């Protein structure tokens, strides 16, 4: 009797193990198949659709977005950078891309990093590390040298060590309002502005930014971005007239939809622009399949951060609407000439 029970028990264990093995094989095949799908270089021909999105460019007319106003050419996000791009004789940019954060006194300054530690002499000036802009007033931050750690093409740091009156005005902390006023006084450009703050500060930044854009009649030439879902939801609820880009999960959703070519109704996607890296993560988003699908659904596609000329040309060839680059001069030579 005991032997019979042991045989039954062994048989049951064997069946369970076989079932588990089959399940694992099925899961592995599914994961492998899905991996192949999201990493595949789809070779669809670029298509033209009847769209209403002004940021969808004609094939071959890929727009150039100066990342942080051309961060490899000039100290990022400074007036010097905006001046340099606008006054350059050898290249032009279509967009200025920059990030904004709120100060203690509700000024919207141009800054990518969480703190000013690595782009200025803030640690030395304030005597502390982790100098967050929201802890200081604009007037306090205006004393900083925002070109402190900038390296030029030769690896030199031409503005390092400037202090006090030695710091030119175009190397000091810059507000979004001043930057936009200067640029618009020169010519009309497009802008991609990312709100870096989250939570209450993110909402406050959105309010301030909207007021600036509205007062300057720039609502139709600005794409507002954020990686923070709470900020996106706040924008959607309070400022539906703004053009905006997708946040992470929205971008992932469109990407998956594009692989399976899911037929979505008009207006399904609540964003106007997809701004993604082509191949930074596991997923291969730099494909004509994704661009065609986005265009079909009235969504423009910008890729970041593209500093390789071969990649620039490839993305242009598959229908990219814009590339975000640290070197707008090289991008202009590559894409426009």
Show which residues each predicted segment covers.
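Phosphate-group recognition and catalysis centered on beta-loop-alpha active-site segments
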Residues: 2-337
């Amino acid at each position: 009797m005991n032997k019979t029970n042991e045989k039954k028990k062994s048989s049951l264990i064997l069946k369970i193990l076989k079932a588990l093995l089959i399940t694992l094989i099925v899961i592995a095949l599914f994961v492998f198949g899905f991996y192949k799908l999201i990493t595949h270089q789809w070779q669809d021909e670029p298509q033209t659709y009847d769209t209403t999105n002004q940021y969808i460019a004609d094939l071959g007319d890929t727009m150039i977005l100066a990342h942080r106003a051309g961060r490899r050419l000039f100290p990022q996000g400074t007036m010097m950078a905006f001046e340099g791009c606008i006054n350059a004789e050898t290249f032009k940019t279509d967009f200025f891309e920059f990030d904004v954060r709120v100060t203690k006194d509700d000024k919207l300054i141009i800054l990518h990093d969480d703190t000013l530690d690595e782009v200025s002499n803030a640690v030395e000036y304030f005597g502390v590390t982790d100098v967050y802009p929201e802890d200081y007033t604009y007037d306090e931050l205006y004393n900083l040298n925002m070109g402190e750690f900038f390296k030029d093409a030769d690896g030199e740091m031409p503005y390092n060590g400037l202090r006090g009156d030695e710091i030119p005005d175009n190397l000091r902390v810059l507000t979004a309002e001043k930057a936009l006023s200067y640029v618009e006084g020169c010519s009309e450009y497009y802008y991609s502005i990312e709100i870096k703050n989250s939570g209450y500060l993110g909402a406050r930044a959105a309010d301030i930014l909207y007021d600036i854009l509205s007062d300057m009649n720039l609502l139709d030439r600005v794409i507002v971005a954020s990686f923070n879902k709470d900020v996106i939801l706040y924008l959607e609820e309070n400022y539906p007239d703004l053009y905006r880009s997708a946040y992470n999960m929205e971008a992932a959703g469109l990407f998956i939809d594009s692989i399976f070519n899911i037929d979505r109704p008009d207006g399904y996607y609540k964003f106007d622009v997809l701004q993604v890296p082509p191949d930074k993560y596991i997923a291969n988003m730099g494909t004509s399949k994704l661009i065609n699908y986005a265009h079909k659904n009235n969504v423009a596609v910008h890729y970041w951060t593209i500093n390789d000329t071969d990649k620039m040309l490839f993305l242009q060839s598959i229908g990219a609407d814009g590339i975000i680059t640290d070197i707008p001069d090289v991008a202009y030579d590559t894409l426009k000439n």
